[in-house]
Amino acid sequence: MDRKELLDSIKHQLRNSVYTDEDFLQHASHSIDELDEVLNILFERLTNWYSIYLPEIQHADRRETYLEVVQIYDKTDPKTAEKLSERAKALVDTIEGESIGSVIEGKDLEILREYAVKLKKLYELRSQLESYRDYKAKEIAPNLTHLLGEALATKLIVYSKGLKRLAHLPASSIQVLGAEKALFMHLTKKTKPPK
């Protein structure tokens, strides 16, 4: 083997050993968790802000429905209710009589609608990341995924820092994966043990 072939071989080995599919799965899982935190904060901000305009729908059962109402509905124009889906119409119909919210027009309403559009895009990104995570989990650990489902299989792989390490862990260690904080509290402060 000459020097160039040897270097190419080493580069190939390094490339394959540095980043594994498990790394991509781990990043996807962490991205979903972080995106959930961000989405919760942003959605709460939107509901607080939009409740100035339409406080009656603040406690919608589904976020997608709420975002649709924010994007489309205008309480000063009843025709906008016709553009809503059935679920969103039902939510708007819960408002008895005239809304007690303030009148918001122009740029103020426009920015709320744009906020809802961007938030919806983030929910779509989260959905894409979930699909990718599920695909990767099935690719990496089909048997584990079949037994536990994609989300839980991913969490186990991520918490154990790899599928190979997970395979070598004793059952007692697997039981407390993700419950380190609860186990520490139990051992130091005599609280209830993690289940």
Predicted segments, located by residue:
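Structure-specific DNA junction-binding interface
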Residues: 1-120, 142, 175-176, 183-187
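Phosphate/ATP-binding catalytic cores across multiple sugar-kinase/actin-like superfamilies
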Residues: 122-140
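Phosphate-backbone recognition surface of nucleic-acid-processing proteins
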Residues: 158-195
